[in-house]
Amino acid sequence: MKQNNPAATGKNGASPVVQVIEVVKSFPVGDSKVTVLKGISFDVTVGEFVSIVGPSGNGKSTLLNMITGIDRPTAGQVIVTGQEVHKLSENRLAAWRGQHVGIVFQFFQMLPALSLLQNIMLPMDLANKYAPRERRERAMHLLGLVGLQDQAHKLPGMVSGGQQQRAAIARALANDPQLIVADEPTGNLDSRNSADVFDLFGRLVDQGKTLLMVTHDKELARRVPRIVEIIDGRIARDEFVGGAQWAGY
């Protein structure tokens, strides 16, 4: 049975950026299997900011992996930016992801031997997007967007965790993706840096980006307009928690 989905019709009738349809994901464990996602369905439309919450080990990060194509469902469909992600070959999947999805990881995953500037240029190089000279200019612009232009030539290990996370967000924006997916983006940050990251996410959504975020921080999650709560591999709650808390954040 398809779960209640308050955003199925989208903002102003917009088409979904993300469609998750009856998705099941099981992993083999010895001679048996463990089912982590149990028939999940929901849509996300252009310009939405959605927080995915729930206890550890209940399928939140697995769901993000389905949406980004890092992993594939055992059953069901995952359609993102019009592509049936679960059906793409690895080569086509990598090309699609490089163009359409920006991923912000919990532990930054910046290449330690490259400067912040080089790390942000790398997705453009891999996707062969933008002219070589424009890539550098764009990377500097993105570093300026996250307040790190003066740190451009430093290695990741020379800046703070909060600065690395902001650089990781800039890297996720390198190819101007329609969708940004963030897995515990504030999990290793103090409250001030967490607030800065959320403020940046809010500005990106205001500019028309679509953002999906997994978080354990209940207070920050409440500031996001829509919450999807996953418990035991199923959607237990999918609701809008109000523009009043989000407005002016």
What is each PLM-predicted segment?
Residues 1-26, 237-249:
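ABC-family P-loop ATPase nucleotide-binding domain
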Residues 227-240:
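H-loop (His-switch) and adjacent beta-strand-loop-beta switch element
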Residues 16-230:
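ABC family nucleotide-binding domain
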